[in-house]
Amino acid sequence: MNHLSSLIRLVFLPIVLVACNSTAEKPQENKSQGDKPKELQKSKKDTLERSYFEEQLADSLLLEKTKKEALLEVVKRFKGEDLDFSYVIEDSDTSYLAVTVQIKKYFEDEAYYAIIYTNMYGWEHIDIYKLGNQSIEHKVAGKHYHFPTDTIFDVNGDGTKDFLVKSYPLSSCCRANIYDIYLSPAAKKEVVTSYIDLVNPTFYPQEKLIRGVEYGHPGWTGLYKYRWRGEHLDTLEYIYPDPTTKGRTFIKMHTSSDFFLKRNNIRKGTRLPSLPEEYKTVEDLDWFLLYGEGTFDTNF
């Protein structure tokens, strides 16, 4: 009997061990199978990221190559007088790539400047070069803009012409006419490389002032007034609708304020019965006034 029991135990034990091992291995198989979709997703993500990076790198290299070739064209074609030319680059990997060059004596230093517009996928890159007798100086390396317009005039009233680029972002919640201002200081009489950016400005060079509309929703965004001090801007004031009167009157502040978030700031301002006359010529005033009484349905 004891011998039979021992024999049964010897036979039964391997069966139990095999069963246990089989049971223990199944979760590992399931786990391995469950990891496959995650690994595939990670692989696809890595491939997409690598593809995007490679595409961006290729575009960047092509853009720089195009700019260098445009500058070589300037050197080859420029004969010491005004010159305009443009061309489209045929490239199977690029939907659209074009170059426009304009060369004139734009500023008061009597030097010739080449403004090079490189358009890639609808984004325009603007570069300005000063053309000397023995050298070419890169004065402006502009950002990429979406369908920009540029102009040259004396923006700060110092008697010298400045270079301005106006653009509009592809996406925004609110009015956003963006200006990049490249000044030409009176002492140098040539365009400088740094710039000042402003949103929704209107320029008053004879007064050495800028009046404009801040970025934000009507009713909560303000008007601003800046004064030029050489190549610098000083903040003078901000005008906001008074939420306590549902926007029928206004409040003048010396700092930019957010009455919706900081209601106590209302007490710091000067109450105005009406909008000051000087602001009625601001180009984006319609956006500032685009509010109704319902805008201020919060208790103040």
Annotated model-derived regions:
Residues 1-8:
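Bacterial N-terminal signal peptides that target proteins for export
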Residues 9-18:
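Bacterial N-terminal signal peptides
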Residues 119-123, 173-177, 218-221:
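Short, solvent-exposed loop/turn segments at conserved positions within beta-propeller repeat blades
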Residues 21-107, 207-300:
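Acidic, small-residue rich beta-repeat scaffolds with periodic aromatic anchors
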Residues 128-134, 174-193, 225-230:
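Beta-propeller blade repeat segments, especially FG-GAP/WD-type strand-to-loop junctions
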Residues 108-115, 156-167, 208-212:
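Acidic/hydrophobic-patterned starts of short beta strands in beta-sheet-rich repeat architectures
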Residues 99-106, 146-155, 198-211:
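Beta-propeller blade termini
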Residues 87-91, 136-142, 190-193:
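A short beta-strand motif characteristic of beta-propeller blades
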